[in-house]
Each structure stands twice: as structure tokens, then as C-alpha cells.
Amino acid sequence: MKDDGINRREFLKGTLAGGAVATTAAVGLAPQPAQAQQKPAAASANPGYSFLNLEEAAFVEAVVDHMVPADEHSPKGTDMGLNIFIDRALAGGWGKGDRLYMQGPWKVGHPNQGYQLPLKPSELYRAGIAATNAYCKKTYSKTFDQLPEAQKQEVLVGLQGGKINFEGGLPARTFFTTMYQTVIEGMFSDPIYGGNRNKAGWRMIGFPGVVAVHAQNIDKFRDKKYTVEPLSIADLS
């Protein structure tokens, strides 16, 4: 994000430090095969959406492009495929809550106890998008994706700080941290999951990829800058 909230440097600092996200990881199960995806819900998403509807896709695209704007470090979020990564995560096992205990009892917990809601991640995302758009319509008479950048920033900072209250009691901060987490994971996950297109996230931080053995490079690059073309799972398959 830009200006008043989290700039790119602070955004990445929080990422590499582990962040403050108290939800489950979105990557861990097999990625959804491309041929199983539905007809694209929006023209800007080439591979098509499996979970997000038109309104939700517009929201997610606006969020990832605001959090990850195009600059000298990387392309914008949609060009990195972060919206596709999020859609696949929501459509897959993580979004369905496959690895979550979903039988209650449901009580308000502490942040160090992890995710405590009776909603599957996909349900949280869907409800959070609808609630955020409802707030934006009430406050600005527009949906989130229609807002200028400064107002998008106000909304995201409000969600992050828990200063926006959703009707029905859905915790805005939990929605934000879940959304923030999936943006981070989309930036730095293996491209096979839909995000980090062209390994742009890895190139930005100098990550070499999935190479498991570096012993042969210890002497070769001693006291030298280690510059290498990053390798993904697909490169080694």
C-alpha cells in the first residue's frame, strides 16, 4: 500500500519478519488444475476465476493492485497473478477449511490462539468483501474498487486497525489479516499456485527458488554477489 499506511518497504519488512497474521496458511494442498477453472469472471484475469464472482473479483483486483502497485521493483498485483492465487486458494482445500477444526465451541479468542471463527476461509472472504463494499457504499456511495487510491487507503487502514465495524459482528481486522496474508503468499509462493507470475516476487528479493542444494555455490560465490535465475517447481519437473 502507499502513503499513510504501509509503503512497499514496510510491507516487505512485515512480510519477511513473519507478519502479524493469525490465520491458517493458504498454500499447502495441491493447486487447482487450470482446466477445472470456470469461464473468466472478469476480462483482466486471463486464467479465469474458480470461486470469485464479478463483484468479488473486482474487489480483490483493486486490493492487490493497491497493496502491490507497479514500480521499479515489481509489476502490479494483478500482473503478478495475486488475484488468481487468491481465487485458487479460496476454491481449494484451504478455502474449504479442510485443515481447520470447524466443530466449535466458538468463543472470542486471543490472537496467539490463531483463527477462532466458525467461518471457513472462503466464507470469511466472501462475507468480508460484501461487508467492506457495504461500508464503502454507505460512506462513499461507491464500492471499494470504484474508490480513488486515497480512499482505498483509508478503508484498508480502518480494516487493519479494527476501526471499521461490520454489521453482524464480523471482525474487520480478522478479514484484513487473512486478506493481507494471501497477498503475501501470492507474492512469494511458487508460481504453480497462480501468483508470483514470472517469479517477480522472488526476483524482487533475490530468492533463488526451490533449489535444495547450495553446497556447490559456497566457494564459487564466496565474497561475491549471488545472482542466479530463480527456479520453480515447474522448472525442475
Describe the role of every protein-language-model region.
Residues 2-3, 44-45, 55-62, 73-237:
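Mature-region segments of soluble proteins
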Residues 3-10, 25-65:
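C-terminal segment of N-terminal export signals and the immediately downstream linker at the start
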Residues 10-14, 144-147:
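Conserved catalytic-core segments centered on acid/base and nucleophilic motifs
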Residues 15-20:
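Sec-dependent signal peptide hydrophobic core
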Residues 68-69:
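Structural recognition of short helix-loop-helix hairpins that underlie histone-fold modules
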